[in-house]
Each structure stands twice: as C-alpha cells, then as structure tokens.
C-alpha cells in the first residue's frame, strides 16, 4: 500500500478540503484535524500540518499538492547533476538555466516538498518551494537577460547553441564547487550530435560524460529541482522587467504578448522591446503590424 507524507501550506489544505468535502469522515484520533475517505485512498490531515495519504490512489491525490512520483531508474539512485532551462519559449523575459546536484539521501525530502517538473506546478507553488530548494540543494543558476540574449543571437549563437553554452557553463561552475556526480543528465532540447557540435566552440570544458534524455524532469529529481529553480528565476526576472517598464509582461508567445509588445513599442520604441523581449521571435513583427493598423 502506497504511503505518502506531505507538509503543504494551509491554503493548499483548505483548497483540497473544499474540493473533496463530500469525502470528509469522522476520526477518533485527537491529532487528526480532518479525515477523508476517497476512492482508493484515505487522507489524514494532522494538527501538526502534516498530511498522510495511504492507498493505491495516494499518488493521484498527492499530485493536488504538487507531488510527482519520480520513475525509479538505476540512474536516479546515484549522486547526479541534472539541468533544465526555462524561458526559451517565452517572448518576454530572459533565459534561465540551472544545474542542481542531488544525492539519494535527499530524495524523500524533495518528494515531501512536492518537487516536480515546473510545468506541472502552479507558479504559486514554485515561488513557495524554490527558496527552500535554493537553500538546501547545491546548484548553479544562470540568467541570460533579454538584452544580452539579443546581443549574442545571430552573431556568435543561435537559439540552440546559446542553450548548449548555458547548460555547459552551469554544469562547469557547479563542478568547480567540488560536487562529485556519478552521472550528469540534461533535459534534452537537441540531439547529442548537435550538442557536441555546438559544445566544441565553448572554452570551459569538463571530462564528465553527459546524458541528454527527453522528459528527464520526470525521471530524475535533480532535473526536477533545476526545473523549479529555473522557473522561479524566470518569473522573478519577468516581474522585474515589467515593473521597470510599467507593464505586466505575460509568459509565452501568444496574442497577449503581441498586444503588450505593441504597447511597449509605442511607448519606448525598439529600445524598450530590446530590454524585455527576445527580438527574433515573430511577436516583434506582429507588434509592429498592430501599430500600423
């Protein structure tokens, strides 16, 4: 029988209770605030703030709090470095890349914290747990600002080679701190052949072999940690850039980005967009066309 213990926020607890209020049941245990009988699982919410989920459906209900079961592979049970990036698909904001070093004895702590791929967690949950991860987990975070991104793209780098450079540098700097991984995993964003081709132009190199794996954030907690910290760094940068310009900058590259981009273009010109956006995205031309209407 699966058993999962979590310590979520009171706000998340209340949201869970509201969602499953019809499953509330009495409990004689004086230390249990709420007890729920759900299909294939029971949930005990203790006065201490801890939550115990038991049963075949425990993982399903734990995912409400951001818990993600990580695939148990032989590689997962090694001290390893995992890397991930956030921001490459967003017009506004910089490009954040993080390398994190995780050891097997940290796995329980990370799962109880609710660590998972940043794409499966709410921004609120990410902002809540990222500071804890930054304090407890050895990592190296890099942020390429939009203006610097625009400076290097089209000159020395393209959209793929710049990510190779950042992932390589994050790993290199983390290794310089003395960590000793038995494996290094990168959440694959290109082929190994392409990665090696672009890596050849980088100065800082290391001898450790690397593995590029698709959906690595669901297989390795080190990659999941990097995903969360990178998302937090990206969101913080997005907020700071927007604050300086007086606009709320949306994430992504949809029509909302086109609209805000046209407003910034009208107010500040191309200099304003260069400050906060990745200019080679199609959103730039769409923003210009909006002003021509």
Swiss-Prot record:
Residues 78-293 form the RNase H type-2 domain. Its cofactor is Mn(2+); Mg(2+). GO terms for cellular component: cytoplasm; ribonuclease H2 complex. Its EC number is 3.1.26.4. One of its GO terms (molecular function) is RNA-DNA hybrid ribonuclease activity. Transmembrane segments: none annotated. Keywords: Cytoplasm, Endonuclease, Hydrolase, Magnesium, Metal-binding, Nuclease. Gene3D superfamilies: Ribonuclease H-like superfamily/Ribonuclease H, TATA-Binding Protein. Disulfide bonds: none annotated. It catalyses: Endonucleolytic cleavage to 5'-phosphomonoester. A divalent metal cation binds at residues 84-85, 187. GO terms for biological process: DNA replication, removal of RNA primer; mismatch repair. It is an enzyme of class 3 (hydrolase). It holds the Pfam family DUF3378. Belongs to the RNase HII family. RnhC subfamily. Endonuclease that specifically degrades the RNA of RNA-DNA hybrids. This is Ribonuclease HIII. The lineage of its organism: Bacteria, Bacillati, Bacillota, Bacilli, Lactobacillales.
